[in-house]
Amino acid sequence: MKTDQPPNSTGPLPKLRNLHPNIWAATATSFLTDISSEMIVYLIPLFLANVLGVRTAIIGLIDGIAETTASLLKIYSGVLSDKLGNRKWLAVLGYGLSTIAKPFLYFANSWGWVLGVRFGDRAGKGIRTAPRDALVAASTGEETRGLAFGLHRAGDTAGAFLGIGIAALIIWMTQTNDSLLSVATFRTAVLVSIVPAVLAVIVLAVGAKEVTVAGKKSSVMRLSLKNMDNRFKSFLFVIVLFTLGNSSDSFIVLRAQERGLSVLQTMFMLMTFTAIYTVLSGPLGALSDKVGRRRLIIGGWLAYGLVYLGFAFSATGWHIWALFGLYGVYYAATEGTAKALVADLVPDTQRGTAYGLFNAAIGLSALPASVIAGALWQGIGGWNGFGASAPFFFGALMALLACVMFWRWVR
């Protein structure tokens, strides 16, 4: 199999033209995948609540189980990619599985059916994420790593923006009353989402190449923190702490509807978020190469805490809309930067495993995070919870604690 080494970056500033073709292939794949995914992912909680009448605790459970499924597979796909030295085809397999699962949402008539499809979709994400991130990391030098991950994230969010825009167009064309989501609108969005999903698999399979990694491949599929840098271990702990307060964005969508935004207005709100996220992802990723990952992550988490406080105190849907735009700053500052920090903290030969552990820490924390948020909002069983503001107060508190721990422990 032909292999390529990442080209060396020249000059004091990172240049887009020096990035390895794998970065562009991964970016294009994520762009197409997010067109597909974002067309339907934010409609799912509205479908569950508006059409099936599901309570927020169950919605949180569905999102949590889906993310936990992904997290468990992220662990072993990362370890397996280190063992085989093969990043590309594991990633292709994961994208393919998600593409196969999504069309079955068309037939969903219960929350259990939705859970099953989400399970398959996120299983695909779990398989692909760690080897894809390891491929990106291996295809760039340290001096441009933040830029590479920022560019990849920008492609991801650009696709999300377009996907949500297509969803908004479908809503406008298929619903005369958009205060609640209709079954016909949801099914139309599912059908249209299949096309970019298939194209994404083709782009990665054809456009990416394996990159040789210096050092000996792992001969055993072993998941262990034993030989990892202590700073990486501390970072994982802090990530878990933060994620426990970072419940599914489904709750923000439901909060927007609860505060009076229509389905179409909610899509425009999401487009505002993704536009800000897309514009800032690349520059903030490159900024982390200059000022340091640590400062940017802390700044992003502080922004998250302030935005979540705003969600808690919001009185109208327009407040949610404005705050969700600022939420894009948090995402842009932290998503790519955190992944670049992982690459900084471990050697090349451990990166697949490290990304598996990193993504698993987030995913395993997502289940309790979303269940806690749903329970705080509407309760479980005979308990009615504390109301719609409660999960956002909790998220703001956890973000503050994570900032303090990160500042003290990860240097």
Range-by-range predicted roles:
Residues 89-104, 194, 295-310:
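Structural signature of the two symmetry-related core transmembrane helices
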Residues 2-20, 209-239:
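Juxtamembrane intracellular "pre-TM" segments in multi-pass secondary transporters
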Residues 172, 194-215, 402-410:
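C-terminal membrane-cytosol helix-exit motif in multi-pass small-molecule transporters
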Residues 61-79, 271-284:
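Central cavity-lining transmembrane alpha-helices of secondary-active solute carriers
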Residues 46-51, 162-184, 368-387:
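Transmembrane alpha-helix termini and helix-breaking/packing motifs in multi-pass membrane transporters
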Residues 12-71, 232-269:
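Helix-loop boundary and gating motifs at the non-cytosolic
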Residues 117-158, 341:
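Cytoplasmic helix-loop-helix junction between adjacent transmembrane helices
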Residues 150-168, 359-369:
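Glycine-rich segments within core transmembrane alpha-helices of 12-TM secondary carriers
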